[in-house]
Amino acid sequence: MDIDLPEVVAEVKAAFDRYEKALTSNDLGVLNTIFRNDPRTIRYGIGENLYGYDEIKAFRGARSPVGLMRTTARTVITTYGRDFATASTLFSRATMPGKLGRQMQTWVRFPDGWHVVAAHVSLIDEPKAA
């Protein structure tokens, strides 16, 4: 199996960047196309467990568009073959002082492009500087 083929990493990076832009601008149209429209798609959030595309879409539609801007760090995209990838990133928001967010996504290439099939978002206390 080929791991981290440069052209596949670039494709997933572009999809991840598209997600980030849509997330921080609350572009529901784009967000709704990124997650796989399937009842098996799962998103575990900071305060919610969403099972299936319909629950994810409803959550996004009901969420406040205020305070979504964030800064990402240590983003790692790893691809396995040409059709499977993970994207992991840390994030911080001005609205969450002292907290560090962590996000992991599982991406799969389908005939219509790359989609998230599973995601997990969590918060921890920001580590103290040594």
Predicted regions and their residues:
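Short, hydrophobic secondary-structure boundary micro-motifs
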Residues: 31-33, 43-44, 71-72, 117-118
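Surface-exposed, charged secondary-structure patches
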Residues: 4, 11, 46, 54-99
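Hydrophobic pocket/interface hotspot
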Residues: 19, 31-32, 40-41, 52, ...
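Short beta-strand edge/turn micro-motifs at domain boundaries
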Residues: 86, 100-129
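Hydrophobic alpha-helical segments typical of transmembrane helices
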Residues: 15, 27-30, 59-60, 73-74, ...
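Short beta-strand segments enriched in hydrophobic/aromatic residues
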Residues: 35-36, 91-93, 120-123
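A short local loop/turn or secondary-structure capping micro-motif enriched for an aromatic residue
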Residues: 51, 94-97, 124-127
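Short, low-complexity N-terminal intrinsically disordered segments enriched in polar/charged residues
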Residues: 1-37, 126-130
